[in-house]
């Protein structure tokens, strides 16, 4: 990936910014998906047929027609076939610009956000805004599957490497869901840590748990956006394990009132936006 790309140098990430309290859709900034997909060789055709970046917006507020502040939580689903990623700091600044803006209804806010995000992403976006009382009905969930974290192994490499993926898949064909809560990468621009849990669902030759964990831990000093990390993991597993079916789904902890949860699959539909214990 060309980290010196002009569009990346223009991002507000890592720079002092002014917070606006009047609605301004121009605050949204896009990162072209092709920048990372070029390095993976998947610009023209992606190995996943279904994908979405699932966001939860915890800090959403506006004024009603009488000037009374309203607060809500929203789900946003951005199709992975869209041209662009939404840069998270710009998303936060954009949402803050609603704070002193009057809207007739929650539905009007929802339509406005959906329209603005669709234009920025250049693709399909859905937005659902919830009252706090409705969102409170959601219970804390966890990924289904076997957790691979409690292995009695020594690890001393934390820079990204694909070495451990050599010979990762052997034996009979199985259908499994594997989970790790040890995913940690760093922001592409600021190097701030991004913490997440990951679920890998597949049909294929059985994956070696130790090799898989070593590979995931190697992201610990790796600098990429959430969405890019998940696509890299998907592509690497397809290359080295060659499963018949594969899903990679990561849920990251929130920052700035937003959490980002990329989902990529070649056989499953987009899941409901759950909430995990660290979210």
Curated annotation (Swiss-Prot):
Keyword Manganese: no
SUPFAM superfamilies with a match to the protein in the record: Tetrahydrobiopterin biosynthesis enzymes-like
Primary localization: cytoplasm
Amino-acid positions noted as binding substrate in the UniProt annotation, renumbered to this chain: 86-88, 226-227
Entry EC no(s): 1.7.1.13
GO biological process: queuosine biosynthetic process; tRNA modification
Record's subcellular location: Cytoplasm
Active-site positions on this chain: 187 (thioimide intermediate), 194 (proton donor)
Pfam families the record matches: QueF, QueF_N
Protein residues bound to NADPH: 88-89, 255-256
Family designation: Belongs to the GTP cyclohydrolase I family. QueF type 2 subfamily.
Subunit structure: Homodimer.
Protein name: NADPH-dependent 7-cyano-7-deazaguanine reductase
Organism expressing this protein natively: Glaesserella parasuis serovar 5 (strain SH0165) (Haemophilus parasuis)
């Amino acid at each position: 990936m060309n980290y010196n790309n002009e569009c990346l140098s223009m991002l507000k990430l890592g720079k002092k910014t002014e917070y606006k309290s009047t609605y301004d859709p121009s605050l949204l900034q896009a990162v072209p998906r092709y920048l990372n997909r070029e390095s993976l060789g998947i610009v023209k055709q992606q190995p996943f047929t279904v994908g979405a970046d699932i966001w939860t917006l915890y800090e959403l507020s506006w004024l009603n027609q009488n000037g009374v502040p309203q607060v809500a939580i929203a789900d946003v689903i951005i199709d992975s076939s869209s041209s662009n990623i939404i840069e998270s700091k710009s998303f936060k600044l954009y949402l803050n610009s609603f704070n002193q803006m009057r809207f007739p209804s929650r539905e009007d806010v929802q339509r406005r956000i959906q329209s603005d995000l669709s234009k920025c992403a250049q693709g399909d976006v859905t937005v659902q805004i919830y009252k706090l009382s409705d969102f409170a009905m959601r219970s804390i969930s966890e990924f289904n599957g076997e957790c691979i974290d409690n292995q009695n192994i020594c690890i001393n490499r934390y820079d990204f490497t694909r070495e451990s993926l050599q010979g990762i898949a052997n034996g009979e064909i199985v259908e499994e869901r594997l989970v790790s809560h040890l995913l940690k990468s760093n922001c592409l621009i600021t190097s701030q840590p991004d913490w997440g849990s990951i679920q890998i669902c597949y049909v294929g030759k059985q994956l070696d748990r130790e090799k898989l964990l070593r590979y995931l831990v190697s992201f610990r000093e790796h600098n990429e956006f959430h969405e890019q990390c998940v696509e890299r993991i998907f592509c690497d597993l397809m290359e080295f394990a060659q499963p018949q079916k594969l899903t990679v789904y990561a849920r990251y902890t929130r920052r700035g009132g937003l959490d980002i949860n990329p989902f990529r699959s070649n056989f499953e539909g987009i899941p409901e936006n759950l909430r995990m214990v660290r979210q």
